[in-house]
Amino acid sequence: PVLQGLRDVPVPVSVDTIKPEVMRAALAEGASMINDINALCAPGTLAVVAATDAAVCLMHMQGTPGTMQQYPGYGDVVAEVKAFLLERVRAARDAGIASERIAVDPGFGFGKTLEHNLELLRHLRDFDALGVPVLAGWSRKSSLGKITGRPAADRLAASIAAALIAAQNGARILRVHDVAATSDALSVLAAVEKKR
């Protein structure tokens, strides 16, 4: 019923799911994007998205939601996340999903330590090599709490700072809670960068 009610809203609707049956139902009800924390690895998910004109965001996660933060470890977090996402972008293209419909998300906070998250943010531009837009979601993340010592409700300034850094480092899509404040900050950044 919620998706039906949003059909007349003039903005894209993204549905977060890893299940092909939920994807199918959501897309049939008018969702225009699937956000999959498993990067369309589950059987049937590639085919469901490929059969539509919907966009998809492929996210990296080490482990599962229940285990991802127990012992995250990488030899080279940037190289490993990039290699995984490259493989998933290729799989999506091979399934018939056009590059114009694909975005990638390094999965900040999903099976990563604070230092892993910061290293990915520092090297976000490396993901431009994948040839699809990069999505960054730092808004109110626990990593920001570790840096600032503030609870989630008090992380607006930190969230905006992370969003601006992500944008400067190549992110073309930002997942945020505080849309107006982040938009204002991005407008200032754009005005400054226009004069460079």
Region spans (language model):
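Phosphate/pyrophosphate-binding loops at sites that engage ATP/ADP/AMP, CoA/4′-phosphopantetheine
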Residues: 88-101
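Active-site metal-binding loops of divalent metal-dependent hydrolases
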Residues: 108
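Active-site-adjacent loop and "lid" segments of alpha/beta metabolic enzymes
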Residues: 1-12, 17-23, 27-28, 32-91, ...
